[in-house]
């Protein structure tokens, strides 16, 4: 891997050089040039009804197609979380009118490049590096959004101009934003090229009425066409000026939630050339460094002869870090970070490590097998199309011994309700999970053959298991 011997990044010479020997974590900010040159530091979720153009908008801004999997391309829907990074630039020529002075490019573009707008001079300079978390627009999304597998700082809410507003999932997503307490929202009225001006104005009124009284009230509404890249620079301007730079914790022990993992070795590879497994995820806090020792919890889960769950955390070392195609020497919170490790690649292949937590040795939270939560149920089922003027089905109370799907971090696992009181419930988990008291979890119930979000909860306490560690 480039540059892991010398402690400086050798890949991408046109980007800012990172040097581990001079790194002072306490001086870093989400706008430090050495970080935003190579990785994103602000996460923006794209949400909205299916086929309203979320992935297309991300592609228009970043140049990255987030739909990477074959079955997604065929069905034209996003199934897994897609991440795409984009650098936002501003021209340093004051005579250039806004919004033309803003521009977005892919994450490996140089930090400065000369203007190509006739009649202007100067350079485009990097001002933000954002990561778009392109969520699948269905129920999975709800769970993914709620359980904080991705730290989201802001959201782009997409509404297609050629359909009436609101569509069922749009209201569901607004509910999720409310629950997550996301305050910074931009509403994009997409597909504006398909409608007449009068229709666009009429829908603008509908959108205003729809967001009234919600967390999105007062959010700017920008008419765009993602396919024609119309008004995309306006979106860039709003990203720079309307979304405040988040406060990040760079000094704590690092922690990363794994949302993807893979084996990068090709079949038939020589034994000496084998590379360790790669885990991808979003860093919640702290800074990961190349060469650092790391621990993954819960690790390898098995049952002993009595059928009790056992966990064996995995210990390893970071050999490389990267964000999209950029090599890193250290990685901060924001965007999807790939962590190259020395872990046995078979443990990582095909997303096997999803739901695990990776961090500094000895600094990770407890492993729980049972949780006691205080929970809140939604009044009605969301996102279910209702006939005519019928109200959506009410959410039934939790009952003892029913099985729910629980989403914690990036882990989805079954959970049996073992006891339930007014607003407290005890849940026995099918798989152990590494988490801590105070974390939010999402609860889903099987309704008509689909998992539907019914509420969310917060961990109050639980039953933990002591991980087993080999003495060798």
Swiss-Prot record:
Residues 76-80 are annotated as: G2. InterPro entries: EFTu-like_2, eIF2G, eIF2g_C, eIF2g_dom_2, eIF2g_GTP-bd, P-loop_NTPase, T_Tr_GTP-bd_dom, Transl_B-barrel_sf. It catalyses: GTP + H2O = GDP + phosphate + H(+). Belongs to the TRAFAC class translation factor GTPase superfamily. Classic translation factor GTPase family. EIF2G subfamily. Its main location: cytoplasm. This is Eukaryotic translation initiation factor 2 subunit 3. Disruption phenotype: Morpholino knockdown of eif2s3 produces morphants characterized by hypomotility and morphological deficits at 2 dpf. They are shorter with a curved tail. They also display a significant reduction of head size and small eyes. Residues 457-469 are annotated as: Interacts with cdc123. It is found in: Cytoplasm, Cytosol. GO terms for biological process: cytoplasmic translational initiation; formation of translation preinitiation complex. Residues 39-247 form the tr-type G domain. Eukaryotic translation initiation factor 2 eIF2 is a heterotrimeric complex composed of an alpha (EIF2S1), a beta (EIF2S2) and a gamma (EIF2S3) chain. eIF2 is member of the 43S pre-initiation complex (43S PIC). It comes from Danio rerio (Zebrafish). The keyword Secreted does not apply. Member of the eIF2 complex that functions in the early steps of protein synthesis by forming a ternary complex with GTP and initiator tRNA. This complex binds to a 40S ribosomal subunit, followed by mRNA binding to form the 43S pre-initiation complex (43S PIC). Junction of the 60S ribosomal subunit to form the 80S initiation complex is preceded by hydrolysis of the GTP bound to eIF2 and release of an eIF2-GDP binary complex. In order for eIF2 to recycle and catalyze another round of initiation, the GDP bound to eIF2 must exchange with GTP by way of a reaction catalyzed by eIF-2B. GTP binds at residues 51-56, 190-193, 225-227.
């Amino acid at each position: 891997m480039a540059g892991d011997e010398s402690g400086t990044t050798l890949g991408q010479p046109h980007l800012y050089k990172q040097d581990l020997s001079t790194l002072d974590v306490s001086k870093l900010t989400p706008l430090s040039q050495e970080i935003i040159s190579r990785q994103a530091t602000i996460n923006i979720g794209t949400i909205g009804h299916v086929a309203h153009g979320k992935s297309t908008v991300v592609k228009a801004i970043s140049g990255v197609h987030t739909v990477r999997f074959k079955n997604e391309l065929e069905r034209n829907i996003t199934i897994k979380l897609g991440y795409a990074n984009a650098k936002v630039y501003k021209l340093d020529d004051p005579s250039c009118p806004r919004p033309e002075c803003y521009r977005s490019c892919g994450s490996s573009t140089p930090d400065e490049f000369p203007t190509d707008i006739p009649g202007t001079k100067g350079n485009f300079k990097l001002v933000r590096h954002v990561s778009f978390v392109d969520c699948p627009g269905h129920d999975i999304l709800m769970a993914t959004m709620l359980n904080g597998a991705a730290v989201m700082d802001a959201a782009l809410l997409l509404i297609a101009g050629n359909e009436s507003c609101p569509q069922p999932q749009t209201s569901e997503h607004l509910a999720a934003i409310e629950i997550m307490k996301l305050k910074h929202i931009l509403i994009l009225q997409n597909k504006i090229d398909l409608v007449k001006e009068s229709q666009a104005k009429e829908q603008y009124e509908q959108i205003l009425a729809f967001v009234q009284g919600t967390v999105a009230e007062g959010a700017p509404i920008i008419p765009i066409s993602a396919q024609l890249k119309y008004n995309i620079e306006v979106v860039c301007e709003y990203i720079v000026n309307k979304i405040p730079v988040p406060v990040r914790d760079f000094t704590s022990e690092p922690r990363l939630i794994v949302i993807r993992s893979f084996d990068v070795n090709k079949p038939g590879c020589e034994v000496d050339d084998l590379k360790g497994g790669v885990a991808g995820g979003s860093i919640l806090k702290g800074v990961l460094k190349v060469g650092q020792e790391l621990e993954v919890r819960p690790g390898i889960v098995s049952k002993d002869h009595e059928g009790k769950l056992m966990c064996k955390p995995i210990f390893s070392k970071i050999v490389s870090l990267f964000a999209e195609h950029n090599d890193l020497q250290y990685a901060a919170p924001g965007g999807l970070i790939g962590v190259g490790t020395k872990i046995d690649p078979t443990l990582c292949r095909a997303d096997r490590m999803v739901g695990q937590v990776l961090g500094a040795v000895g600094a990770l939270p407890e492993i729980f097998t049972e949780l006691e939560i205080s929970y809140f149920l939604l009044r009605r089922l969301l996102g279910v199309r209702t006939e005519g003027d019928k109200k959506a089905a009410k959410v039934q109370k939790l009952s003892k011994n029913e099985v729910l799907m629980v989403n914690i971090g990036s882990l989805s696992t079954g959970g049996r309700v073992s006891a339930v009181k007014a607003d407290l419930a005890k849940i026995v988990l099918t798989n152990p999970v590494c988490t801590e008291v105070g974390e939010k979890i999402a609860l889903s119930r099987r309704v008509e053959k689909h998992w539907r979000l019914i509420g969310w909860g917060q961990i109050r306490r639980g039953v933990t298991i002591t991980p087993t560690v080999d003495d060798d």
